[in-house]
Amino acid sequence: MENKQPLLSICIPTYNRAEALRKNLANIVSLEGFDDDVEIIISDNCSTDNTQEVGEYFSLKHPNIKYFRNAKNINDSNFSTALDHATGEYIKLLNDNALILPEGLIYLKEIVITNRTKRTPIFFTDNQIFTKKKESIIVCSDLNEYIEALSAFITAISCFGAWNEQWAIVNERTKYSEYKLNQVDWAFQIVSKFNGCILYDQQYYRGFQPGIRKGYNWFDVHINNFYKIMQPYIDKGLIDKKTVKIDKINHLYHFKPEIFQIFFYPWRAYWQYDTTDSFKILWSHYKTYPYFYWLMITAPFWGTWSYIIVPKVVKPFLNILGLYEITRKIIKRKQ
């Protein structure tokens, strides 16, 4: 009997996070909706821990989980390698430290089925959109609307996905590997070639932190590199200068926690990204933006309240009274 093409491929690039991967896969196989319509791709970037043991264990136990190991570490090119292994109708990336929620897999499959005839580009943005919070489904007609809606979250690995045939025509997939943001260019190519997309913003996973966050230069990647990737699309007239200006403000707003911890209250216990030339990078992009000056002047005040007083004083006090979850839900509904 001929093998049926999977409906959905979930592609997990991983490196030296064996226990995180084990936790992730154990969760996936327990979910309602985990069946032959779902293919799991594990792309091991030549890990030196026991990632191979974990991957092979689950792939032997479940035929629809496929484990691949790179002969050498190929850095961020592993993201495209993971997608290249996928055979599903719709293929998407998932971080190795992202646990799909109990109803999440059913949700993903239902959305794919809804769109499988028209093949409109779709992205699962996991309740990350802060520019249009009240809309759980956002239809974007071009790159400008896509950037306006998603902004900094375009860089999120788990937000990227594509119909298999659309992925097949993405050019130069590893062009921006050194920038650590290949996925941004992939999304820009797809949205511009197919005249828009649909963003599904319902939360479908929750992340967990397997260790200290560290690695690249935070603002060099998320500011310098992001806008370097955007530039060719600006030059072609696919992204308006007005969109760039608005997006830069959205980026700055999104990175308020990082600004506070880099310049005012270092949290080196769990956040150890390279911060070399952070102010220089921000200055080069924002010296003409009044919001930048307001943000830097007021950061000690809103930062102390949001990231010190609330978690260390307000939250414990409300927990004692049994009111924290109620308060959090009320605030979330009003947003």
Language model features: what each stretch is:
Residues 27, 44-54, 72, 95:
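A conserved acidic beta->alpha catalytic loop
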Residues 36-46, 68-70:
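Short beta-strand/loop segment that forms part of the nucleotide-sugar
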Residues 70-86:
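Glycine-rich, basic loop-to-helix element that forms the pyrophosphate-binding segment
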Residues 99, 103-137:
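Conserved donor NDP-sugar-binding/catalytic core segment of glycosyltransferases
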Residues 143-225:
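Conserved nucleotide-sugar donor-binding catalytic segment
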Residues 185, 192, 199-335:
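C-terminal subregions of glycosyltransferases and related glycan-biosynthesis enzymes
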